Amino acid sequence: GAYFDGFDVPCVPRRDDC
C-alpha cells in the first residue's frame, strides 16, 4: 500500500499516504 522503509504497508501512523 504505502511504501515505508522499502516495505509495502497498508496504513501506518508514522508515514502514511492514504
Curated annotation (Swiss-Prot):
One of its GO terms (molecular function) is toxin activity. It comes from the Eukaryota. One of its GO terms (cellular component) is extracellular region. It is found in: Secreted. Keywords: Disulfide bond, Secreted, Toxin. Expressed by the venom duct. Its main location: secreted. Disulfide bonds join 11-18. The cysteine framework is C-C. Does not show any effect on voltage-gated sodium, potassium channels, and on nicotinic acetylcholine receptors (10 uM of toxin tested). Does not show antibacterial activity on both Gram-negative and Gram-positive bacteria. Negative results: does not show effect on Nav1.1, Nav1.2, Nav1.3, Nav1.4, Nav1.5, Nav1.6, Nav1.8. Does not show effect on Kv1.1, Kv1.2, Kv1.3, Kv1.4, Kv1.5, Kv1.6, Kv10.1 and Kv11.1/KCNH2/ERG1. Does not show effect on muscular (alpha-1-beta-1-delta-epsilon) and neuronal alpha-7, alpha-4-beta-2, alpha-4-beta-4, and alpha-3-beta-4 nAChRs. Belongs to the ConoGAY family. This is Conotoxin AusB. The lineage of its organism: Eukaryota, Metazoa, Spiralia, Lophotrochozoa, Mollusca.
